[in-house]
Swiss-Prot record:
Protein name per the record: (S)-8-oxocitronellyl enol synthase CYC2
InterPro entries xref list: NAD(P)-bd_dom_sf, PRISE-like_Rossmann-fold
Family recorded in the similarity comment: Belongs to the short-chain dehydrogenases/reductases (SDR) family. Highly divergent.
GO molecular function: oxidoreductase activity, acting on the CH-CH group of donors
UniProt-listed CDD domains: 5beta-POR_like_SDR_a
Gene label: CYC2
Gene Ontology biological process terms, A to Z: monoterpene biosynthetic process
The keyword Oxidoreductase belongs to this UniProt entry's keyword annotation: yes
A UniProt-annotated Pfam family: PRISE
């Protein structure tokens, strides 16, 4: 079977060993956002010996110093603030051998117009630094997401989103959206440089490992479960009845990475936008039991008689509790606000269920998939192994 199929069912990967003989690299990747939830998966998967398009040499860019949990990946780490044109040019223009860019980062601002401005500046700085220098640059993967179909957070309830299931041919909504800004910049850049192709990847809510991610739903729920366990309280669902009961889709971070690599090396996938989800359906009420089991905490059914309380409200004074959990369990030193994004979990667990279609990816030859329950367990195991949660 193909590498995509083998990866999708969790077949053992050929890990790159530091004492392997030097390899002549066919492709050179630049991961923008290497410590993010998908960037970390790309940093794990690209260096594997049989990854399509390889052998790969990998550069990874992030704003902060390299974290310990990312340090084992055979990646040349570059600390760079890509919102700063001078820093970006100084750090990235020497990378003349780059053949593929994987854009898996974003920056948040109070308004969507500001998001458009800042994220557009970041992409422009990277393209301006690389395109004149990297003669063999021929593909850019841009990761966006379901907000392409429902609008930015500030527009929720103000504009009419598309009706699920989402398909890639749905028109843009009439609202500012930095996803649209980045797509337009990508297409414009490809039109100016001969041989430069692109792909856009639109995942659902992402299940993956990255303590630094602003939108890490599973990491946040792991912290919530650990606090419930520590305080000997039931694991209550903080969202709505609709989210508890309805069918949902998720996107495993490794699957998204594989999807992007496929699009980067397969000629039939170039210059296209694709949804990217696991290919199955789940209900939060079923995953909630799994989460409770993994942390040995009492599971609580959704109770309609109780007034809903957001995680932002429940967790607002739990900083000292988290410090105690970290100290007692010998965990990696973190602040609660650094490992848990309560507002994002409230958005996901308080909203309507958003389904998409993977038909276009299948029609173009991508058959990867994930079991969402197993994806959840895998992320929890990784959080524990890296001593982020007990």
């Amino acid at each position: 079977m193909s590498w995509w199929w083998a990866g999708a069912i969790g077949a053992a990967r050929k890990k790159f060993e530091e004492d392997d003989a030097p390899r002549d690299c066919q492709s050179v990747a630049l991961i923008i956002g290497v410590t993010g939830i998908v960037g970390n998966s790309l940093a794990e998967i690209l260096p594997i010996s049989d990854t399509p398009g390889g052998p790969w040499k990998v550069y990874g860019v992030a704003r902060r110093p390299r974290p310990a949990w990312n340090a084992d990946h055979p990646v040349e780490y570059i600390q760079c603030d890509i919102s700063d044109a001078s820093d970006t040019h100084t750090k990235l223009s020497p990378l003349t051998d780059v053949t593929h860019i994987f854009w898996v980062t974003w920056a948040n601002r109070p308004t969507e117009s500001e998001c458009c401005e800042l994220n557009g500046t970041m992409l422009r700085n990277v393209l301006n630094a690389l395109i004149p220098k990297a003669a063999n640059l021929h593909h850019i993967c841009l990761q966006t997401g379901h907000k392409h179909y429902i609008g930015p957070f500030e527009a929720f309830g103000k504009i009419k989103p598309h009706e699920p299931p989402f398909t890639e041919d749905m028109p843009r909504l009439n609202a500012p959206n930095f996803y649209y800004t980045l797509e337009d910049m990508l297409v414009e850049a490809s039109e100016k440089k001969a041989g430069l192709n692109w792909s856009v990847h639109r995942p659902a809510v992402i299940f993956g490992f990255s303590p630094f991610s602003m939108m890490n739903i599973i990491g946040t729920l792991c912290v919530y479960a650990a606090i419930c366990k520590h305080e000997n309280t039931p694991l209550k669902f903080p969202g709505t009845k609709a989210a508890w009961n309805c069918y949902s889709v998720a996107s495993d971070a490794d699957l998204i990475a594989e999807h992007q690599i496929w699009a980067a090396v397969d000629p039939y996938a170039k210059n296209e936008a694709f949804n990217c989800s696991n290919g199955d359906l789940f209900k939060w009420k079923h995953l909630w039991k799994v989460l409770a089991e993994q942390f040995g905490v009492e599971y609580a059914e959704f109770d309609e008689s109780e007034k809903p309380t957001s995680l932002v409200e429940r967790m607002k004074d739990k900083g000292p509790v988290w410090e105690e959990i970290v100290r007692e369990n010998g965990l990696h030193t973190t602040k609660l606000e650094g490992v848990a994004t309560w507002w994002f979990a409230d958005v996901i667990l308080g909203g309507e269920c958003l389904l998409d279609s993977m038909n276009k990816s299948k029609e173009h030859g991508y058959l990867g998939f994930r079991n969402t329950k197993n994806s959840l367990i895998s992320v929890i195991d990784k959080m524990k192994a890296h001593k982020i949660v007990p």
